[in-house]
């Protein structure tokens, strides 16, 4: 299976997302695509986390609302099919409401990792929905279903191989398989993030399949 990886700049705008979709479907071959969050999104999520740490709920909510408006605008640029447009906007509303929910709890590094993970969850869901709108047989394989690191923060290769092989044996008949670049589960089954360069591990792992 062909493997392609795109960073945040490559999916940094609706136009660039469209370009990525053209590129990954051009060969017609089954392709595993690893995506990062849209450029700027991770920085915004870190800023939101910093506000939550300081218990500045208004500050956090302001950034969340700005980010939500931006993504809603992106949805209008990408999704001309009204049904798909409504579905993706409903998904976006749910994600941003989820971000706002952190104002009710004690905020720790555990919650921060969950907040930061939302960037890749947003980008991969949007790209997958756009591909489907264009008639491409595409599916999203959440990285949290297979990607795991051990207590040394290194990819747990045995676990990853086992899980991804099982998933791909079930998810057949697709041209494009989308997943996230950095989010994962840690040795304690908590949401975590790979270290810098971690998505390279992910790409290498799929290339070896």
Each PLM stretch: what is its role?
Residues 1-208:
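Nucleotide/pyrophosphate-binding catalytic subdomain
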């Amino acid at each position: 299976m062909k493997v392609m990886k795109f960073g945040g700049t490559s999916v940094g705008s609706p136009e660039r997302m469209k370009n990525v979709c053209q590129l990954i479907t051009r060969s017609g071959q089954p392709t595993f695509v690893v995506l990062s969050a849209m450029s700027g999104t991770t920085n915004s999520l870190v800023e939101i986390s910093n506000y939550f740490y300081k218990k500045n709920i208004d500050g956090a909510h302001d950034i969340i609302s700005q980010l939500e408006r931006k993504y809603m605008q992106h949805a209008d640029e990408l999704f001309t099919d009204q049904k798909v447009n409504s579905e993706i906007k409903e998904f976006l509303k749910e994600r941003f409401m989820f971000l706002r929910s952190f104002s009710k709890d004690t905020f720790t590094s555990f919650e921060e990792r969950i907040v930061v993970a939302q960037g890749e969850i947003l980008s991969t869901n949007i790209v997958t929905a756009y591909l489907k709108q264009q008639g491409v047989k595409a599916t999203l394989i959440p990285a949290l279903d297979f990607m795991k690191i051990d207590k040394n923060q290194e990819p747990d290769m045995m676990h990853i191989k086992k899980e991804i092989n099982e998933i791909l044996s079930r998810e057949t008949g697709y041209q494009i398989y989308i997943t996230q670049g950095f989010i994962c589960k840690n040795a304690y089954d908590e949401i975590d993030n790979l270290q810098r360069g971690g998505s390279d591990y992910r790409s290498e792992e799929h290339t070896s399949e």
